[in-house]
UniProtKB/Swiss-Prot annotation:
Domain of life: Bacteria
Designated name of the protein: Ribosomal RNA large subunit methyltransferase E
Annotated function: Specifically methylates the uridine in position 2552 of 23S rRNA at the 2'-O position of the ribose in the fully assembled 50S ribosomal subunit.
Localization: Cytoplasm
Protein species of origin: Nitrosospira multiformis (strain ATCC 25196 / NCIMB 11849 / C 71)
One cellular component (GO) term of this entry: cytoplasm
Record field: catalytic activity: uridine(2552) in 23S rRNA + S-adenosyl-L-methionine = 2'-O-methyluridine(2552) in 23S rRNA + S-adenosyl-L-homocysteine + H(+)
Amino acid sequence: MKRTKTSKAWMKEHVNDFFVRQAKKEGYRSRAAYKLMEIAERDHLFKPGMTVVDLGAAPGGWSQVAAEKLKGKGRAVALDILEMAPISGVTFIQGDFREASVLAELKEQLKDLPVDLVICDMSPNITGIRVIDQTRGMHLAELALEFCTEQLNSGGNFLVKVFQGSGFDEFFRAMRATFHRVVTRKPLASRGRSSEIYLLGLGKRD
């Protein structure tokens, strides 16, 4: 018997509840950790020894995964406007990514090290007004992409959360101009009703 939309939505919510429980059980700070795990395993994103930058890191789920994958070999630098409790193996900077002084501090922490992977799960403060939220969300993604054009190593990768809507097509084209390959990912832990989707840029162009 074909599932109805309602039953599919229920199943998705049930799975999401599972990830919430699993995160608490396994010590991850957010269910978002499982989104990164799924994508990282599928696309082989992490290798020990690499330099990783996590933008919009708080509360730290993605940074936890990055630190585990690096296994003490490499560097992980995380940034967020909100406070984040320390994570072993991760350097944290608190500040607004949109401010030049904060971006300069991030670059100083990297000390000219080539960045191999940028992961970005940033979201704007939600107003509930779709047009405003979409515009702000795309702006954050654009800033992260701009950071990649300046700091990401040739051949490096970029994973970013975006929301489908106004500005998405233009941003996708900008990603394709920056990377050899761009794919979309919707991990199981992502809420089914959400318009969020992850874009993965593979192999930054010279």
